[in-house]
Amino acid sequence: MRNIKLTISYKGTAYAGWQFQKNAHSIEEALLDAIHQVTGEVVKLYGAGRTDAGVHAQGQVANFTTASRIPPERFALALNTKLPRDIRVMESHQVPEDFHSRYSAVGKIYAYTLYTAPIESPFYWDYTWHIREVLDLRAMDTAARAFCGEHDFRGFMSTGSAVKSTVRRIDTLTIEDHSPEIQLTIQGNGFLYNMVRIITGTLVAVGMGKIKAEDIPGIIESGDREQGGITAPAQGLMLKKVIYSQ
């Protein structure tokens, strides 16, 4: 048996998220079906992150074990002939038996894109959060720095997931102005459920003047979800990269 690592890009608009669901289309289901068509095997697929409905990925990672004799690097081409156009395997490699896409990861990079203009673009609505107001990017940048470092982010998670600890480390959080698009890029050692989207919603609230940048440390310390901003819409979020030590 060989352990195969896949690097996957997908547009999440038409899917109910990564995880397999009985009554809805998922990214995992599409990949499992493609693997079955190519190998004739029913496998278990392990994803690095369970992206929600509407969330996209440029660098999602998954792995599975197979007895197939297909060369590891050829899996990408073979699977892409069976996948819908909005899902593509960008790379495939054989990895050590103990590699696990989720548990071997040491960090992730996410990007969130805002579209700041009076009128929403018909071309970018499914990749961005449309914001009509002019945002104070300087205040947002100040607030972003307060999120960096190791903190208890219990106030920046949605209910619905059980975790042993709500402490996470954010290594970098940057805001780039490509008007009318504004991109937030966040790298950390792990993220709680909806953590990136809630941080984004909070930074947008700072940009609108609804929350003061200097209040962010206190909001983090409080652990009170009600003090933060809204959960930003799913469609602006993209999993850019999963980081491994080797």
Language model features by range: what are they?
Residues M1-Q246:
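Structured-RNA-binding interfaces characteristic of tRNA pseudouridine synthases
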